[in-house]
C-alpha cells in the first residue's frame, strides 16, 4: 500500500512572559538513575526542548525520526513507535525523567507511546546496549524525555507561556498554556495542551490498496477488487487518520540546602483512528469465502468501518534527593511512580449522514470494545558513593506491573511482572583513557497463563455448543529468572580535534509478557499471534567504535557497530499454514453455503481463517551497521550557515542466512541550518532507499524522499515578554511510499 502525505503548513504563536530577564544559560546534562553528566562514552543525542515546541505536534517517533540511527514504526498520525539501530519493541525503552514509561505500547504496534511532549527540557537518545544504565533489557537503546515538572532548582521568576498551532493537512489545531513560579517557597509547575487533528488530506488516487492474493483461483474477483480500490482512491483523505489528545500536568517541589523533594501528576487522554487496519485484510478474505454481494450491499448501507482507540492515563510521581555528606555516601536520589493506564480499542460503522454520527457505536454491537490496562508501581534509590578519583553510584529499583486485556480481542490473559534491580556505575580518568563501566543484576518474575482453544468440535454437527465451550484447558506459568548485564567504554583524545571511543556490552533480556503469553487474534495487525512460555532469554554482545572530529568550523563523526544476539525473539508469519487454513475454510463454505450469515461469521471467528498465523520464535541473529555524519559552518551575512550530511545503515540476518523481518532501510539525511540573531531557518531532506533485504513473507519497500522546512522568528522588545512564530512545511513536494502492516 502507498500513501501520500500532503504538505503541512503550520503556524505556531508562542508567547512567553518573564518578569525579569535571565542571562544565565543552564548547562545541558544527561540524566538517569545512574549518571547525571555526559560522562559515558557512547553514541548519544541530547535534543533541546525547543526543537519540539517550535516544530509541529507529532508522535514521539516522528519528532526524532531525522536523527541518525533512529527511525519509526508508523501506524498513523498518532502512533510512531521508535526504532533504534533496527531494534524495536521491548528492546527500546521510553523513559520519563529517567523512569520507564509504563503504558501499553508494548502490547501492540498500533498503540501510541503515552508521553506528553509539552514544555519538555530535552530528549536524550542513547543508542545501543550501553543504555543498560537506564533500564533492563535495552539492547536497542532508550529515549528519555526530561522536563522540570518536579523542579530540582528554585524558579527565580514567574513565567507564563501560551501557544497556538494550526495544521492545514488535517484541518487541525493545538493550544497550550504553561505556568511556572515560586509560591511561598514552593516551586509550582502547571501545563496544559489540547490537540485536535482531523483526517489527513491526500490527492485523489493517492491511497492504493494492494492486498496480496492467497489463492490461485481468485482471478474472477479482480474486477470487483479494483472497483473497491477506485472508491478508496477518490476519498481525498486517509480514513481513520485523525488524532485528538488532551494533556494536563501539575507539579510542586521544595528545594533546600539538604536537597529537594516534590510530586507530580500527569494526566493524558486521547482518541485516535487506526488507518489501514487489519480488519480490511480479514474482510477481503471474508468476501472471498462468503457472500460477496451481500457484503457490498452492507458496505453501501453502512459506509466505511471505523476502528479507533481511546486512552486514559494518570501518573503520580514523587522524586527527591537528600544530601547525606557522609564518609561513604554523599547523597541519595529516590523516586516513586504509580501509573494507571487504559486503552480501549473499538470498531464502528461510519454513517454517511452526519446526524447519525452519535449512533456509530450502536450500529455494530458484535464489535465489542477491547480494553488494555496496565497498572504499575515503581520505586528506587541511587546512592552516590563518588570520591575525588572517580564517580561511583549504586542503584536499587523495584517494579510491580499488571497487564490485562478484556473484551472481544483479548489475545492475552492477565499477567504480572515483578522486577528487582541492583546496579553499579563507575567513571574514572585513567590518564591515557577515560573509563566508564556499568553492571546490573535483574531478578524478574513473570506470572501468566495461556488458554488453549479447542477447535475439534467447532466444525461438527453440534454448532450450538461452540460458544459454551470455546476454550480448553488453561495452563499457568510462573517464570522466575535472574539476568545480568554489563557495559564498558574507553575513550581517548588522539589530538586536540580527534577523539575515539570503544565500547563493549553484554545485555541479557527476559522475554516480555506478550512474547510469553500472547495467544489470540490481533485484528489491528490482521494476525493470530501466539507466544511461547518456554522462550529463553535473549543475550546480546555488542561492540562499537566511534570517531569524533571537530576543529570549530568542520566536524565529522563515524560510528560502527556489530551486535550478536543469541536467541533473538521475532514474530514470524506462518504463510503456508495460513494458506492451508484458508483453503480448508473455503471447502467448508462451499459445503455449508446454504447456512445463514450468522453461522458463517461464527465459523470464521473460531477458525481464525481470516488472520495470518504468527508465532514468537527464537533464532540467533546478527545486527551490524554504521552512522556517519560530517558538516561545515560558514559565516554568511550577519548570520551563520551550517551544512551537514548523514547516512545510517543497519543490516540484520538470522544464523541460517535469511533476513530479520521489519528492518528499516538505509537513509541519507541532508541538512541546512541558517541562524541570525532571532531568526532560524532549517531545511532537511531525508532520502530513504529501497529495502530489498526483507524477511520471509514480506514485500519490498520502495524508496522515497521527504523534505521538511521550518522558519522561526523571535520578536523581542514586547515589554517583559517575547513572541515566537514558526512557519513550517513537512513534505510539501514529495511523495512518500510506505509499506503498511498487512
Which positions does each model-derived feature cover?
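Conserved C-terminal beta-signal and adjacent last beta-strands/turns
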Residues: 8, 21, 182, 241-248, ...
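Short, acidic, small-residue-rich periplasmic hinge/interaction motif at the N-terminus
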Residues: 21-53, 89
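Short acidic/polar hinge/loop motifs at secondary-structure boundaries
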Residues: 100-129
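Outer-membrane beta-barrel translocator/receptor signature
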Residues: 119-122, 132-208, 242-246, 257
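Transmembrane beta-barrel wall of Gram-negative outer-membrane proteins
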Residues: 170-196, 209-275, 308-329, 386-391, ...
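Flexible loop and strand-edge segments within Gram-negative outer membrane beta-barrel domains
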Residues: 241, 245, 259-332, 338-376, ...
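Surface-exposed extracellular loop regions of Gram-negative outer-membrane beta-barrel proteins
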Residues: 340, 443-457, 461, 465, ...
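Gram-negative outer-membrane beta-barrel transporters
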Residues: 432, 561-565, 574-576, 580-583, ...
Amino acid at each position: 500500500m502507498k500513501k501520500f502525505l500532503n504538505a503541512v503548513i503550520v503556524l505556531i504563536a508562542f508567547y512567553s512572559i518573564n518578569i525579569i530577564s535571565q542571562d544565565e544559560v543552564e548547562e545541558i546534562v544527561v540524566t538517569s538513575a545512574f549518571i547525571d553528566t555526559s560522562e559515558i562514552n557512547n553514541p548519544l543525542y541530547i535534543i533541546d526542548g525547543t526543537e519540539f515546541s517550535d516544530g509541529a505536534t507529532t508522535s514521539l517517533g516522528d519528532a526524532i525520526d531525522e536523527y541518525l540511527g533512529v527511525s519509526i514504526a508508523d501506524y498513523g498520525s498518532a502512533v510512531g513507535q521508535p526504532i533504534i539501530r533496527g531494534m524495536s519493541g521491548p528492546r527500546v525503552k521510553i523513559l520519563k525523567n529517567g523512569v520507564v514509561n509504563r503504558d501499553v505500547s508494548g502490547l501492540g504496534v498500533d498503540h501510541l507511546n503515552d508521553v506528553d511532549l509539552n514544555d519538555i527540557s530535552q530528549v536524550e537518545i542513547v543508542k545501543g546496549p550501553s543504555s543498560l544504565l537506564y533500564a533492563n533489557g535495552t539492547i536497542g537503546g532508550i529515549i528519555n524525555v526530561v522536563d522540570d515538572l518536579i523542579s530540582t532548582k528554585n524558579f527565580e521568576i514567574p513565567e507564563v507561556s501560551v501557544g497556538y498551532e494550526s495544521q492545514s493537512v488535517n484541518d487541525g489545531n493545538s493550544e497550550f498554556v504553561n505556568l511556572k513560579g515560586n509560591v511561598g517557597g514552593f516551586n509550582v509547575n502547571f501545563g496544559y495542551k489540547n490537540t485536535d487533528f482531523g483526517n489527513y488530506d491526500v490527492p485523489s488516487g493517492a491511497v492504493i490498496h494492494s492486498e496480496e492474493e492467497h489463492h490461485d483461483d481468485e482471478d474472477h474477483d479482480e474486477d470487483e477488487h479494483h472497483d473497491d480500490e477506485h472508491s478508496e482512491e477518490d476519498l481525498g483523505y486517509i480514513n481513520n487518520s485523525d488524532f485528538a489528545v488532551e494533556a494536563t500536568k501539575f507539579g510542586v517541589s521544595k528545594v533546600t540546602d539538604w536537597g529537594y523533594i516534590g510530586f507530580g501528576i500527569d494526566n493524558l487522554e486521547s482518541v485516535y483512528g487506526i488507518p489501514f487496519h487489519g480488519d480490511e485484510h480479514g474482510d477481503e478474505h471474508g468476501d472471498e469465502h462468503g457472500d460477496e454481494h451481500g457484503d457490498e450491499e452492507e458496505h453501501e448501507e453502512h459506509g466505511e468501518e471505523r476502528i479507533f482507540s481511546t486512552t486514559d492515563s494518570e501518573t503520580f510521581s514523587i522524586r527527591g534527593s537528600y544530601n547525606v555528606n557522609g564518609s561513604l555516601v554523599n547523597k541519595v536520589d529516590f523516586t516513586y511512580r504509580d501509573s494507571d493506564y487504559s486503552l480501549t480499542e473499538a470498531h464502528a460503522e461510519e454513517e454517511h449522514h452526519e446526524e447519525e454520527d452519535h449512533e456509530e457505536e450502536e450500529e455494530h454491537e458484535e464489535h465489542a470494545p477491547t480494553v488494555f490496562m496496565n497498572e504499575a508501581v515503581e520505586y528506587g534509590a541511587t546512592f552516590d558513593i563518588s570520591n575525588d578519583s572517580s564517580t561511583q553510584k549504586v542503584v536499587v529499583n523495584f517494579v510491580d506491573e499488571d497487564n490485562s486485556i478484556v473484551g472481544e480481542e483479548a489475545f492475552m490473559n492477565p499477567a504480572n511482572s515483578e522486577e528487582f534491580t541492583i546496579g553499579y556505575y563507575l567513571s574514572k580518568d585513567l590518564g591515557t583513557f577515560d573509563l566508564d563501566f556499568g553492571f546490573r543484576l535483574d531478578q524478574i518474575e513473570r506470572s501468566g497463563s495461556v488458554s488453549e482453544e479447542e477447535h475439534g468440535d467447532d466444525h461438527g454437527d453440534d454448532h450450538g455448543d461452540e460458544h459454551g465451550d470455546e476454550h480448553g484447558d488453561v495452563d499457568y506459568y510462573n517464570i522466575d529468572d535472574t539476568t545480568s548485564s554489563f557495559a564498558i567504554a574507553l575513550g581517548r583524545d588522539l589530538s586536540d580535534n580527534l577523539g575515539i571511543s570503544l565500547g563493549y556490552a553484554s545485555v541479557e533480556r527476559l522475554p516480555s509478557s506478550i512474547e510469553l503469553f500472547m495467544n489470540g487474534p490481533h485484528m489491528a495487525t490482521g494476525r493470530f499471534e501466539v507466544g511461547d512460555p518456554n522462550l529463553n532469554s535473549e543475550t546480546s554482545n555488542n561492540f562499537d567504535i566511534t570517531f569524533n572530529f571537530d576543529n570549530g568550523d568542520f566536524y565529522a563523526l563515524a560510528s560502527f557497530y556489530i551486535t550478536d544476539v543469541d536467541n533473538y525473539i521475532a514474530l514470524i508469519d506462518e504463510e503456508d499454514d495460513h494458506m492451508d487454513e484458508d483453503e480448508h475454510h473455503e471447502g467448508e463454505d462451499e459445503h455449508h453455503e446454504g447456512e445463514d450469515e450468522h453461522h458463517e461469521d461464527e465459523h470464521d471467528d473460531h477458525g481464525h481463517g481470516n488472520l495470518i498465523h504468527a508465532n514468537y520464535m527464537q533464532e540467533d541473529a546478527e545486527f551490524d551497521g554504521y552512522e556517519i555524519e560530517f558538516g561545515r559552518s560558514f559565516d554568511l551575512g550577519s548570520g551563520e550557515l551550517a551544512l551537514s550530511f548523514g547516512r545510517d545503515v543497519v543490516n540484520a540476518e538470522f544464523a541460517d542466512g535469511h533476513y530479520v523481518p521489519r528492518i528499516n532501510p538505509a537513509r541519507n539525511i541532508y541538512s541546512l541550518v541558517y541562524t541570525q540573531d532571532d531568526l532560524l531557518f532549517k531545511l532537511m531532506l531525508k532520502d530513504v532507499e529501497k529495502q530489498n533485504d526483507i524477511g520471509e513473507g514480506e514485500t519490498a519497500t520502495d524508496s522515497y524522499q521527504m523534505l521538511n522546512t521550518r522558519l522561526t522568528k523571535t520578536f523581542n522588545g514586547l515589554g517583559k515578554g517575547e513572541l515566537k512564530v514558526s512557519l513550517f512545511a513537512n513534505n510539501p513536494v514529495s511523495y512518500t511510499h510506505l509499506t503498511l502492516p498487512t
